[in-house]
């Protein structure tokens, strides 16, 4: 029996799946569903092997309580009743002694299901626990793109096959977005389109490119400005489009005057001739599709980099062509009422917002990171593994090692973070619960 489903992972493709259901507790093969016109039956090897993950003998299937030192992973099995009772008792005592903000629910994108990912916020808001400022992944990219494109939306990725140039910037699509490459290669095969890759190292995607620009990390904005300078100087920009649909003005043009390809080359490490070749390809073929990733935004100037790069399809007028424009994220096209899921009707604006990227400093009592509020004395962690992915892991490890920190981890496997927990709760996988994905 085949059951339709959707991939839950933090990948832009949101692949449609067909899952072989062998019984109510066992699955067989996982395949791509051909009905989705974008993913078209293609899925990555990670999801194709989900049978191995869901039936892995090392899965956590029962609640556990720590019996060894923090980090040892030594646990004993307990009942759900025992686990929930201890969690509630500890949280209640901490709230009475330190206030509700001493408890910090912490999560991210282990699943992209709106209920299983964001539902933790309902508990947070109802109980007035500390908020979470989600800074690890997307903030710089989102802000830069909205300044450069206006809204968090882009061109339907199925239009890639109509493009004359497919620019893959700051994402290793051959590994992380296999469907992008399927459509890009179709455009190259049927329309003789050029695949242009901008990244800071020669990855699997770069090896498939017609033109690869290896940019020094953090200098993508300079490359974009150098290209725009060349376009303007050689009258390859779309003046009518700029006048009609953008806020580009004389001040912006003056800004570009000194941003020559020579200037960009000295900063980016890319040859002047390669920058000019890139600009010519775009200027002579404005039906260009820019697939923008997050990689080039994860530094202090990340938003500025994204702003500059997102301005390229505007100065070219690419947006007016089928197969032209840009895509970074299409989140703005969905209009969910998430009041029930997240408890949006009981948000207290006075509750502090703690930076998830500074979890190490927060757990070690940095007053500024804590906004001069109470120490974090308890955490409920879902859908993320901060002991592996958070910045400054030495501080994170030291923070989680505190004997006075009560940590609850909701997880599928015994991760590094789960090994630090006082209580571990078993988490379902996407085929074991209902959810909504966008």
Where are the language model's segments positioned?
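Generic beta-sheet signal
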Residues: 103-104, 166, 286-292, 377-379
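Active-site phosphate/pyrophosphate-binding segments
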Residues: 227, 246-364
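Membrane-interacting alpha-helical segments
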Residues: 229-249, 387-397
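N-terminal export/assembly segments and adjacent metallocofactor-ligating motifs
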Residues: 1-234, 248, 271, 382
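Active-site regions of enzymes building and remodeling cell-envelope glycoconjugates
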Residues: 209-214, 421-428
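Intrinsically disordered or highly flexible coil/loop and linker segments, enriched in small
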Residues: 13, 96, 100, 236-237, ...
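A structural signal for short, well-ordered beta-strand segments and their strand-loop junctions
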Residues: 104-106, 197, 214, 289-293, ...
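Extended redox/cofactor-interaction regions of prokaryotic respiratory oxidoreductases
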Residues: 117-186, 191-197, 205, 221-225, ...
């Amino acid at each position: 029996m085949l059951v339709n489903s959707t991939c839950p992972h933090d990948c832009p493709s949101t692949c449609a799946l067909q899952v072989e259901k062998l019984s109510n507790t066992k699955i067989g093969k996982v395949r791509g569903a051909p009905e989705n016109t974008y993913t078209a039956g293609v899925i990555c090897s990670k999801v194709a092997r989900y049978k191995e993950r869901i039936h892995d003998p090392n899965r956590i299937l029962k609640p556990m309580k720590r019996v060894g030192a923090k980090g040892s992973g030594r646990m004993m099995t307990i009942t759900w009743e025992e686990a929930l009772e201890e969690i509630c008792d500890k949280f209640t005592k901490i709230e009475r002694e330190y206030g509700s903000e001493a408890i910090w629910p912490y999560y991210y994108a282990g699943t992209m299901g709106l209920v299983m990912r964001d539902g933790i916020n309902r508990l947070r808001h109802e109980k007035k626990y500390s908020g979470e400022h989600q800074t690890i992944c997307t903030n710089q990219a989102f802000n830069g793109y909205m300044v450069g494109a206006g809204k968090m939306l882009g061109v339907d990725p199925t239009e890639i096959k109509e493009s004359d140039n497919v620019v893959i910037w700051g994402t290793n699509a051959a590994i992380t977005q296999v469907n992008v490459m399927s459509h890009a290669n179709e455009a190259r095969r049927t329309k003789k389109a050029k695949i242009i890759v901008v990244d800071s190292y020669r990855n699997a995607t770069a090896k498939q490119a017609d033109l690869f620009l290896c940019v020094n990390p953090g200098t993508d904005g300079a490359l974009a400005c150098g290209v725009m300078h060349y376009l303007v100087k050689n009258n390859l920009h779309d003046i009518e489009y700029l006048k009609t649909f953008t806020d580009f003005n004389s001040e912006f043009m003056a800004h570009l005057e000194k941003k020559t390809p020579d200037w960009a080359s000295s900063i980016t490490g890319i040859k002047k001739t390669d920058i000019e070749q890139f600009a010519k390809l775009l200027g002579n073929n404005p039906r260009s599709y820019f697939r923008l990733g997050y990689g080039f935004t994860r530094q202090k100037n990340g938003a500025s980099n994204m702003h500059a790069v997102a301005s390229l399809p505007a100065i070219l007028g690419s947006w007016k062509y089928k197969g032209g424009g840009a895509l970074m994220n299409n989140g703005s096209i969905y209009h969910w009422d998430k009041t029930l899921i997240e408890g949006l009707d009981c948000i207290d604006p006075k509750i502090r917002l703690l930076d998830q990227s500074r979890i190490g400093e927060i757990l070690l009592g940095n007053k500024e990171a804590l906004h001069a509020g109470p120490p974090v004395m308890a955490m409920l962690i879902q859908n993320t593994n901060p002991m592996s992915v958070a910045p400054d892991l030495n501080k994170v490890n030291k923070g989680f090692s505190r004997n006075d920190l009560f940590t609850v981890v909701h997880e599928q496997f015994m991760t590094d973070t789960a090994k630090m927990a006082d209580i571990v709760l078993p988490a379902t996988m996407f085929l074991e619960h209902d959810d909504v994905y966008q």
